[in-house]
Amino acid sequence: MSLVLAVYGKGGIGKSTTSANISAALALKGAKVLQIGCDPKHDSTFPITGKLQKTVIEALEEVDFHHEELSAEDIIETGFAGIDCLEAGGPPAGSGCGGYVVGESVALLQELGLYDKYDVILFDVLGDVVCGGFSAPLNYADYAIIIATNDFDSIFAANRLCMAIQQKSVRYKVKLAGIVANRVDYVTGGGTNMLDQFAEKVGTKLLAKVPYHELIRKSRFAGKTMYAMEDTPDKEECLKPYNEIADFLIQESPIASVPVPIGDREIFKMVNGWQ
């Protein structure tokens, strides 16, 4: 039985880069990993495969949307450290529903019997709006992970994600493993002062603190995980949080919880204390 992870977070904060490095850390510790990109941009797995791979929606179009004609080989690419990758894709901009495509991709995984093939399945999910389709991975996940930066908009999105996780936990097994603080800047960004307060308020913890570092940014442009980058004096500092997350997830019984989200208006009141 696979360990299923659902990684969410506000768009544009490095969620896919973080997801790819978590997958890499787990794979290098011996896990057979499948990473699934659930975003119409279909660039989640770019750091692992080094390219924009064919999406599920593109593969379905080729067979006139007859699911039964697709095999795993039609939609999965293998990349760094033997990580298998799948991209749900989405409809053309301005038409259709990206969430629906995610739901269909999850159903296709079931049809192909892929859930039992892997030690870890990681869903990297667009997380600004958790509608029915984009929330589908929570139906299967053991743990959700929220990626956030130390700013109000990111924390507001994280709180909405906590609401979705709490709602799903009523019917499904999913729990919140914690929050990954990304792009942590102690010089101009306040470190994690806001995230620390928020995590305590909703009953969770910071899993790791990923530094704001040029090397991580460069790895994304290079189409590589941090583990595949050339060795430099700062590389170990950048790898440390991803290794910490992987170590937490592969322990026998990771401590996780159902979050207790804050009301929207209460979040705005908290802002005054963060100025």
Curated annotation (Swiss-Prot):
Pfam families: Fer4_NifH. Its cofactor is [4Fe-4S] cluster. [4Fe-4S] cluster binds at C97, C131. This is Light-independent protochlorophyllide reductase iron-sulfur ATP-binding protein. Component of the dark-operative protochlorophyllide reductase (DPOR) that uses Mg-ATP and reduced ferredoxin to reduce ring D of protochlorophyllide (Pchlide) to form chlorophyllide a (Chlide). This reaction is light-independent. The L component serves as a unique electron donor to the NB-component of the complex, and binds Mg-ATP. Belongs to the NifH/BchL/ChlL family. Keywords: 4Fe-4S, ATP-binding, Bacteriochlorophyll biosynthesis, Chlorophyll biosynthesis, Iron, Iron-sulfur, Magnesium, Metal-binding, Nucleotide-binding, Oxidoreductase, Photosynthesis. The lineage of its organism: Bacteria, Pseudomonadati, Chlorobiota, Chlorobiia, Chlorobiales. The keyword Nucleotide-binding applies. Homodimer. Protochlorophyllide reductase is composed of three subunits; BchL, BchN and BchB. Coiled coil: none annotated. Its EC number is 1.3.7.7. It comes from Pelodictyon phaeoclathratiforme (strain DSM 5477 / BU-1). The gene is bchL. It is an enzyme of class 1 (oxidoreductase). Binds 1 [4Fe-4S] cluster per dimer. One of its GO terms (biological process) is light-independent bacteriochlorophyll biosynthetic process. ATP binds at G12, I13, G14, K15, S16, T17, K41, N182, R183.
